Curated annotation (Swiss-Prot):
Catalytic activity reported: glycyl-tRNA(Ala) + H2O = tRNA(Ala) + glycine + H(+); a D-aminoacyl-tRNA + H2O = a tRNA + a D-alpha-amino acid + H(+)
UniProt-listed HAMAP family: Deacylase_Dtd
Gene: dtd
Protein name per the record: D-aminoacyl-tRNA deacylase
Domain notes: A Gly-cisPro motif from one monomer fits into the active site of the other monomer to allow specific chiral rejection of L-amino acids.
EC number of the protein: 3.1.1.96
Subunit-structure text: Homodimer.
Origin superkingdom: Bacteria
Function: An aminoacyl-tRNA editing enzyme that deacylates mischarged D-aminoacyl-tRNAs. Also deacylates mischarged glycyl-tRNA(Ala), protecting cells against glycine mischarging by AlaRS. Acts via tRNA-based rather than protein-based catalysis; rejects L-amino acids rather than detecting D-amino acids in the active site. By recycling D-aminoacyl-tRNA to D-amino acids and free tRNA molecules, this enzyme counteracts the toxicity associated with the formation of D-aminoacyl-tRNA entities in vivo and helps enforce protein L-homochirality.
Entry keyword set: Cytoplasm, Hydrolase, RNA-binding, tRNA-binding
Sample GO molecular function, one term: tRNA binding
UniProt source species: Roseobacter denitrificans (strain ATCC 33942 / OCh 114) (Erythrobacter sp. (strain OCh 114))
GO cellular component: cytoplasm
Subcellular location: Cytoplasm
Amino acid sequence: MRALLQRVSSASVAVDGNTIGAIDHGLLIFICAMPGDTKDTSARLAAKISRLRVFKDDAGKMNLNLAQTGGAALVVSQFTLAADTSRGNRPGFSGAGKPAEAQALYEQFAQDLRALDIPVQTGQFGADMQVSLCNDGPVTLWLDTADG
């Protein structure tokens, strides 16, 4: 699985002009399932993200994780994280997981975060979504479970 994390002071996602998910302080997580990903992959990624110390402590150092700050996660599916731009000018997306499997893993990932006591809001899988955010820092991280 691939994830692009942004530390935010606020974020929301809308479909057809209606806000379907919103958080204040926390992480906006764009997520993409890749071929070969499993429920175990999802659980490991959720655990890793929940432990990442990317929030400032009283000394201003990135030393706190999401739960320690009382933050939430907004999880948005984004198959374009699987883009292959190595040839031509049009990205290829054949490296993304098949839609039915990807949707199941997207939903599993949100559930895995909830099981770790992280409040979670989500987008709508496969929908044309408008995502708004106020990046805090900015802090943006790329995680790929294929990297270990």
